[in-house]
UniProtKB/Swiss-Prot annotation:
Compositionally biased residues, Polar residues: 24-34, 98-107
Protein's name according to its UniProt entry: Capsid protein VP1
Note: The capsids of autonomous parvoviruses expose a proportion of VP2 N-terminus and part of that sequence can be cleaved of to form VP3.
Ranges of compositional bias, category Basic residues: 112-128
Gene3D superfamilies: Parvovirus coat protein VP1/VP2
Protein family membership: Belongs to the parvoviridae capsid protein family.
Motif Nuclear localization signal: where in chain: 4-12
Biological process according to GO: clathrin-dependent endocytosis of virus by host cell; microtubule-dependent intracellular transport of viral material towards nucleus; symbiont entry into host cell via permeabilization of host membrane; viral penetration into host nucleus; virion attachment to host cell
Keyword Signal: no
C-alpha cells in the first residue's frame, strides 16, 4: 500500500502553517492570529483563481484585508506579510470591485481587525477622505489607480529593512542604535492615514509598578530652505570695538545647513500639567523604556504670485514635489538637542508648530586678549580664525544618512528605539551631613510644652564616640559622618579653552535658607509663545528660575576654615571668612576656590524640569564619563534615539544653470502630521509615614494659570517634580 500523500506546505515561514506561498488549505488550525489571517487570505485567492482571475499579479481586496488584519501584529511573520502586501499595493494595479470573489455573495459583515497579543484593539477609523483623487480621476481616467498609489522607487528596499530593524529593536532591551525607519505609501494621494492622539495612558501592572505611555501629535509647518547649501559662518561679538565684557562673549563658528530638525526631547511635548501632577504626586521613580515617531499625511503646496498690483498669491497642491526625511540611527552627525535653546516642538497640541534649523559647531581658534586682569574698562582684542586643519569635521546629511523621499499622502516611521538608562527618583532628600546617623544622647529632656523649651546635652568634652578633631571637643559640627552629602563647588568661574571662555557647569541643588542661587546651580529658563509665554502681544519673553527640591545646597557666605590644630576660640588668625583676602589678592573670595568634591561625595541626579527641561541626553564619547549631565536627567548608555531631519526637496524651474550655486526654485512649503509614543515605567509611592505630605495642587487663586485668556493666550508654568520627601540614611 502506497504511503498517504503529504499535504503541500509550500514556502511557509517557520512556525506557521499558512503564512507563505504554495501551501494547501488543509494544514489544520492556524498557529496565531497572523497565520489565521493568512488562511483567510489563501481561501480568497483560491476563489479568485476559480473565477478565472489572477490575484498574484493584481492588488486585491483580499490583500487589503490582510494588511488591516496584521496592522498590529507583533510576530515576525505577520510584520513581514504586512509590509510585503503594502509594497504590492504601491506597485501593482488594482482589481476592480466586480473582480472580488465577495461581490456576488451576501454583504460582508463588518468586523473589527483581528487582535494580536500585546496590542490594543484599534478604534474605528472614518472612511478615507479623498482630497485630490476626484480631480486626478478627471484628468487621467484610466491611470488614477496607479497614480494614487505612487511611491518612491525605494519602497521595496526600505519596507523590509524597516520591518527587520523594528524586530531587532524590539528584541534589544539594551538600547543600541536609534531604531530603523522607512517611508511607505499611504494607499493613495489624499487618503487620510494615521491618527491624532495626545493622551497619556497609565497602566497599573501590579506590585507598585506602572507603565506610562505618552502619545504626542503635532501639525508641523515647513517652508523650503532659504538656500540649498551648507555655510560656515563666523560669529563675533555684537558690540565690536566697545570695551570688552568677557561674560558676554559670543564668538564662535557654526555650520548652517538647509535641513530642519524635529526634536521632541522636552517634557512639555509629552505631558500636560494634569499628567505631571499625577506623576509627581504618586510616583517615586521613573525610567525610560521606548520611543518611536512617525510622519504622515504629507501635504506639499506651491505658491505663485500674479503680476497684478498688489500681487495675488495662488496656492496649488503639488503631487510631484517631495519631502526629504532622514533618520540618523547611528548618531553619525553632531548631536544637537534643541531644548536648551527652547526650539523643540511646541507644547500645545492644538497649535501648529515648526522644526528648528539644523546647525552645529565647527572648530575655531578664539583669540581673546584682555589688557588687564583687574578691570574691564579697556578694549579687549577680539578675533576668530578657522580651526586647525587637523580638527575640522564637516558633515553633510546627504552623504552620512539614508534619505527617504515622500510625496503627498505618504508616511514615514522610525521604528521602535529602546532606552538603556538609570531610573530617576521623583523624590527629594532633606538629609544633610548634619542629620545622618544617631543623634547625640540628651542630658535632660524638657518638662514644659513648647519649642521654646529645648533639651540639653552633656558637656562637649564628656561625650563618648569618635569625631574628626584632635582635641576633646565632640560637637555636632565635628561629628564624623559616613559621606559628604552634596559638595561645595567653585562658582562664577570662567575657564578659558581654545574656543573661548565658558562658565563651569554646576549640578543644580536647592538653596539654603540664605537663598544663594548661583552657587547652587540655579537654571534660568526663557521661552517664547510655543513653549510657555502667555501671549505674543508683549515683546517681553517669559522667564523663570529653577531650583531643585533636594536640600544638599551650600551657603558660601557662611563657610569658614579653621586653623590647625583646632582652637575653639574664633580669633582673627583662626577663622578664614569669605571677606578675608587669600594670598593678598583683592576680590578673590574663599567660596570661589573651595571644592569639596571627592570620593566620599554623595549627590542626587539632575531633577526633571517640566515643561521646558530636556528628557534624555547622549553620553559623551570620552574615556572618563561624567556621573551626571546638567541638561537632562537620563543619559543613554548607548546611542540615543536618532535625530530626525526633514527638508523640502529642490523644486526647480526650467531656468537651470549648472554653473551657478543657486538655482531658481518654485516656492514650495509643506504641512504634515507628526506623532510619537514615549513609554516609561514608574514605581508608585507607598504610604509609610504618619504625616501627610505636600502635594502638587491648585487653589482658587492660581487655577487661572492653567486656562486660556479671553484672546486664547495660555501660559505653561514650571512644576516641581520631586515633592515627596525621602530619607538618605
Amino acid at each position: 500500500m502506497a504511503p498517504p500523500a503529504k499535504r503541500a506546505r509550500g514556502l511557509t515561514l517557520p512556525g506557521y502553517k499558512y503564512l507563505g506561498p504554495g501551501n494547501s488549505l488543509d494544514q489544520g488550525e492556524p498557529t496565531n492570529p497572523s497565520d489565521a489571517a493568512a488562511k483567510e487570505h489563501d481561501e480568497a485567492y483560491d476563489k479568485y483563481i476559480k473565477s478565472g482571475k489572477n490575484p498574484y499579479f493584481y492588488f486585491s481586496a483580499a490583500d487589503e484585508k490582510f494588511i488591516k488584519e496584521t496592522e498590529h501584529a507583533k510576530d515576525y511573520g505577520g510584520k513581514i506579510g504586512h509590509y510585503f502586501f503594502r509594497a504590492k499595493r504601491a506597485f501593482r494595479p488594482k482589481l476592480s470591485e466586480t473582480d472580488s470573489p465577495t461581490t456576488s455573495q451576501q454583504p460582508e459583515v463588518r468586523r473589527s481587525p483581528r487582535k494580536h497579543p500585546g496590542s490594543k484593539p484599534p478604534g474605528k477609523r472614518p472612511a478615507p477622505r479623498h482630497i485630490f483623487i476626484n480631480l486626478a480621476k478627471k484628468k487621467a481616467k484610466g491611470t488614477s489607480n496607479t497614480n494614487s498609489n505612487s511611491m518612491s522607487e525605494n519602497v521595496e528596499q526600505h519596507n523590509p529593512i524597516n520591518a527587520g530593524t523594528e524586530l531587532s529593536a524590539t528584541g534589544n532591551e539594551s538600547g543600541g542604535g536609534g531604531g530603523g525607519g522607512g517611508g511607505r505609501g499611504a494607499g493613495g494621494v489624499g487618503v487620510s492615514t494615521g491618527s491624532f492622539n495626545n493622551q497619556t495612558e497609565f497602566q497599573y501592572l501590579g506590585e507598585g509598578l506602572v507603565r506610562i505611555t505618552a502619545h504626542a501629535s503635532r501639525l508641523i509647518h515647513l517652508n523650503m530652505p532659504e538656500h540649498e547649501t551648507y555655510k560656515r559662518i563666523h560669529v563675533l561679538n555684537s558690540e565690536s570695538g566697545v570695551a570688552g565684557q568677557m561674560v558676554q562673549d559670543d564668538a564662535h563658528t557654526q555650520m548652517v545647513t538647509p535641513w530642519s530638525l524635529i526634536d521632541a526631547n522636552a517634557w512639555g511635548v509629552w505631558f500636560n500639567p494634569a499628567d505631571w501632577q499625577l506623576i509627581s504626586n504618586n510616583m517615586t521613580e521613573i525610567n525610560l523604556v521606548s520611543f518611536e515617531q512617525e510622519i504622515f499625511n504629507v501635504v506639499l503646496k506651491t505658491i505663485t504670485e500674479s503680476a497684478t498690483s498688489p500681487p495675488t498669491k495662488i496656492y496649488n497642491n503639488d503631487l510631484t514635489a517631495s519631502l526629504m526625511v532622514a533618520l540618523d540611527t547611528n548618531n553619525t552627525l553632531p548631536y544637537t538637542p534643541a531644548a536648551p535653546r527652547s526650539e523643540t516642538l511646541g507644547f500645545y497640541p492644538w497649535l501648529p508648530t515648526k522644526p528648528t534649523q539644523y546647525r552645529y559647531y565647527l572648530s575655531c581658534t578664539r583669540n581673546l586678549n584682555p589688557p588687564t586682569y583687574t578691570g574691564q574698562s579697556q578694549q579687549i582684542t577680539d578675533s576668530i580664525q578657522t580651526g586647525l586643519h587637523s580638527d575640522i569635521m564637516f558633515y553633510t546629511i546627504e552623504n552620512a544618512v539614508p534619505i527617504h523621499l515622500l510625496r503627498t499622502g505618504d508616511e514615514f516611521s522610525t521604528g521602535i528605539y529602546h532606552f538603556d538608562t538609570k531610573p530617576l527618583k521623583l523624590t527629594h532628600s532633606w538629609q544633610t551631613n548634619r542629620s545622618l546617623g544617631l543623634p547625640p544622647k540628651l542630658l535632660t529632656e524638657p518638662t514644659t510644652e513648647g519649642d521654646q523649651h529645648p533639651g540639653t546635652l552633656p558637656a562637649a568634652n564628656t561625650r563618648k564616640g569618635y569625631h574628626q578633631t584632635m582635641n576633646n571637643s565632640y560637637t555636632e559640627a565635628t561629628a564624623i559622618r559616613p559621606a559628604q552629602v552634596g559638595y561645595n563647588t567653585p562658582y562664577m568661574n570662567f575657564e578659558y579653552s581654545n574656543g573661548g571662555p565658558f562658565l563651569t557647569p554646576i549640578v543644580p541643588t536647592a538653596d539654603t535658607q540664605y537663598n544663594d542661587d548661583e552657587p547652587n546651580g540655579a537654571i534660568r529658563f526663557t521661552m517664547g509663545y510655543q513653549h510657555g509665554q502667555l501671549t505674543t502681544s508683549s515683546q517681553e519673553l517669559e522667564r523663570y528660575t529653577f531650583n531643585p527640591q533636594s536640600k544638599c545646597g551650600r551657603a558660601p557666605k557662611q563657610q569658614f576654615n579653621q586653623q590647625a590644630p583646632l582652637n575653639l576660640e574664633n580669633t582673627n588668625n583662626g577663622t578664614l571668612l569669605p571677606s578675608d583676602p587669600i594670598g593678598g589678592k583683592p576680590n578673590m573670595h574663599f567660596m570661589n576656590t573651595l571644592n569639596t568634591y571627592g570620593p566620599l561625595t554623595a549627590l542626587n541626579n539632575t531633577a526633571p524640569v517640566f515643561p521646558n527641561g530636556q528628557i534624555w541626553d547622549k553620553e559623551l564619547d570620552t574615556d572618563l564619563k561624567p556621573r551626571l549631565h546638567v541638561t537632562a536627567p537620563f543619559v543613554c548608555k548607548n546611542n540615543p534615539p536618532g535625530q530626525l531631519f526633514v527638508k523640502i526637496a529642490p523644486n526647480l524651474t526650467d531656468d537651470f544653470n549648472a554653473d551657478s550655486p543657486q538655482q531658481p526654485r518654485i516656492i514650495t512649503y509643506s504641512n504634515f502630521w507628526w506623532k510619537g509614543t514615549l513609554t516609561f515605567t514608574a514605581k508608585m509611592r507607598s504610604s509609610n509615614m504618619w504625616n501627610p505630605i505636600q502635594q502638587h495642587t491648585t487653589t482658587a487663586e492660581n487655577i487661572g494659570n492653567y486656562i486660556p485668556t479671553n484672546i486664547g493666550g495660555i501660559k505653561m508654568f514650571p512644576e516641581y517634580s520631586q515633592l515627596i520627601p525621602r530619607k538618605l540614611y
